[in-house]
């Protein structure tokens, strides 16, 4: 008799996705982040659900309700700290996952890559509206500054901003709708993740060499289930260490002050995972230009497949491209640092140069490096 997991309509889908899935035998730990992101999403949805049971989305009580969760709800402090730091873990895994995709040429699976970029944007939107909910100073002013950017859109900008606010400033209506968005978006993300996996399983995973892996595949279970569990334990240890020993390490002290529309914090800045994009936004001394650069900093990922000029898929055997990749990584770290600094010299100039080099490396230097490497690999004798 055939095993039920191979015949039952639902079990068959699970079996073909997580058990009998043919997987390249040589994928490294860089391929662990997909499963870690799945776990992060589940952790965020579960902790978020329990937080939503005690949170009130009203300007008068939102801040107090978060304090109430931390003080009076059983393990509320832990649930809140896991949720807040879980977002940081989520983005850390996301950035490493995208970086892996760029390094090993995973973007050549265009459908998987494109839905992945849309997922990244959706997760960023979810994190932004979520950050507004505790209704601290940085929540309020972050919401005011970022939503105000839409007013740079010609003709419809001002109307659009007031429509999103539900009034003439960030107020009760804004908080209520942001809570609604923050509740629904993770479930939309979950559906998109299924589509992401669907596209991935059409082609199968790539591998570090960039060569066709079809000649040597192994079943996902037990090999990669065990490998994923190891990665999962490491991530959980880091997350729990953060949540229990230094839960406020990555937060902003200003958010411990209730929102006050009459008092602007000296430095308005988002959470660390948005700082690179915020630095690019601030480096352009024009509102509309800054907004376009901000969008371009993420949307540039969509054109990466078109900029692939190399005859090899992976960067594993391409030292010039590797150097550029690590320059890009260092550049993003510099942008993240600059995004958290005040708008004064020398930070302004550093931010502008880092923003220029970010786009230059991706759009100009990487395609040129691919062409140069192709030329260097050509036999020079008849």
Curated annotation (Swiss-Prot):
Q: List the GO molecular function terms.
A: metal ion binding; ubiquinol-cytochrome-c reductase activity
Membrane-crossing segments per the record? 33-53, 77-98, 113-133, 178-198, 226-246, 288-308, 320-340, 347-367
Please give the function described in this protein's UniProt entry: Component of the ubiquinol-cytochrome c reductase complex (complex III or cytochrome b-c1 complex) that is part of the mitochondrial respiratory chain. The b-c1 complex mediates electron transfer from ubiquinol to cytochrome c. Contributes to the generation of a proton gradient across the mitochondrial membrane that is then used for ATP synthesis.
Complex and partners: The cytochrome bc1 complex contains 11 subunits: 3 respiratory subunits (MT-CYB, CYC1 and UQCRFS1), 2 core proteins (UQCRC1 and UQCRC2) and 6 low-molecular weight proteins (UQCRH/QCR6, UQCRB/QCR7, UQCRQ/QCR8, UQCR10/QCR9, UQCR11/QCR10 and a cleavage product of UQCRFS1). This cytochrome bc1 complex then forms a dimer.
**Binding site residues for a ubiquinone:** 201
Q: Which gene codes for it?
A: MT-CYB
Q: Cite the cofactor comment.
A: Binds 2 heme b groups non-covalently.
A further note on this protein reads: Heme 1 (or BL or b562) is low-potential and absorbs at about 562 nm, and heme 2 (or BH or b566) is high-potential and absorbs at about 566 nm.
Identify its protein family.
Belongs to the cytochrome b family.
**Positions that bind heme b b562:** 83, 182
Listed binding positions for heme b b566 are 97, 196
Q: Supply the name of the protein.
A: Cytochrome b
Q: What is the scientific name of the source organism?
A: Didelphis virginiana
The topology of this chain with respect to the membrane is: Multi-pass membrane protein
- Which keywords, in A-to-Z order, does the entry hold? Electron transport, Heme, Iron, Membrane, Metal-binding, Mitochondrion, Mitochondrion inner membrane, Respiratory chain, Transmembrane, Transmembrane helix, Transport, Ubiquinone
Write down the required cofactor(s).
heme b
Q: Which domain of life is it from?
A: Eukaryota
Q: One GO CC annotation, please?
A: respiratory chain complex III
């Amino acid at each position: 008799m055939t095993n039920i997991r191979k015949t039952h309509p639902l079990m068959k889908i699970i079996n073909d996705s997580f058990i009998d899935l043919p997987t390249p035998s040589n994928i490294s730990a860089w391929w662990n982040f997909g499963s870690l992101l799945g776990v992060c999403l589940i952790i965020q949805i579960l902790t978020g659900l329990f937080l939503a049971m005690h949170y009130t989305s009203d300007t008068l009580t939102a801040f107090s309700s978060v304090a109430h969760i931390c003080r009076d709800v059983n393990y509320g402090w832990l649930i809140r700290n896991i949720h807040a730091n879980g977002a940081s873990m989520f983005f850390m895994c996301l950035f490493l996952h995208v970086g892996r995709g760029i390094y090993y040429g995973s973007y050549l699976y265009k459908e998987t890559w494109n839905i992945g970029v849309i997922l990244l944007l959706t997760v960023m939107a979810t994190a932004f509206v979520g950050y507004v909910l505790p209704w601290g100073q940085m929540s309020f002013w972050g919401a005011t500054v970022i939503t105000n950017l839409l007013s740079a859109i010609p003709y419809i900008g001002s109307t659009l901003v007031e429509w999103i606010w539900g009034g003439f400033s960030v107020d009760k209506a804004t908080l209520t709708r942001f809570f609604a968005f923050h509740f629904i978006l993770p479930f939309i993300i979950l559906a998109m993740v299924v589509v992401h996996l669907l596209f991935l399983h059409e082609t199968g995973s790539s591998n570090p060499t960039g060569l066709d892996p079809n000649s040597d595949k192994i079943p996902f279970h037990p090999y990669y289930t065990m490998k994923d569990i190891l990665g999962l334990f490491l991530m959980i240890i880091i997350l729990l260490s953060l949540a229990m020993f230094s839960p406020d390490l990555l937060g902003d002290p200003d958010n411990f002050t209730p929102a006050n529309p009459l008092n602007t914090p000296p430095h308005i800045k988002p959470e660390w995972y948005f700082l690179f994009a915020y630095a690019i936004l601030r480096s352009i001394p024009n509102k509309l230009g800054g907004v376009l650069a901000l969008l371009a900093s993420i949307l540039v990922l969509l054109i990466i497949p078109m900029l692939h000029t190399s005859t090899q898929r992976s960067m594993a055997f391409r030292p010039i491209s590797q150097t550029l990749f690590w320059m890009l990584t260092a550049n993003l770290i510099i942008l993240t640092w600059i995004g958290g600094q005040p708008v004064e010299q020398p930070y302004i100039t550093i931010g502008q140069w880092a923003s220029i080099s970010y786009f230059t490396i991706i759009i100009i230097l990487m395609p040129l490096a691919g062409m140069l490497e192709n030329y260097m690999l050509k036999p020079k004798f008849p």
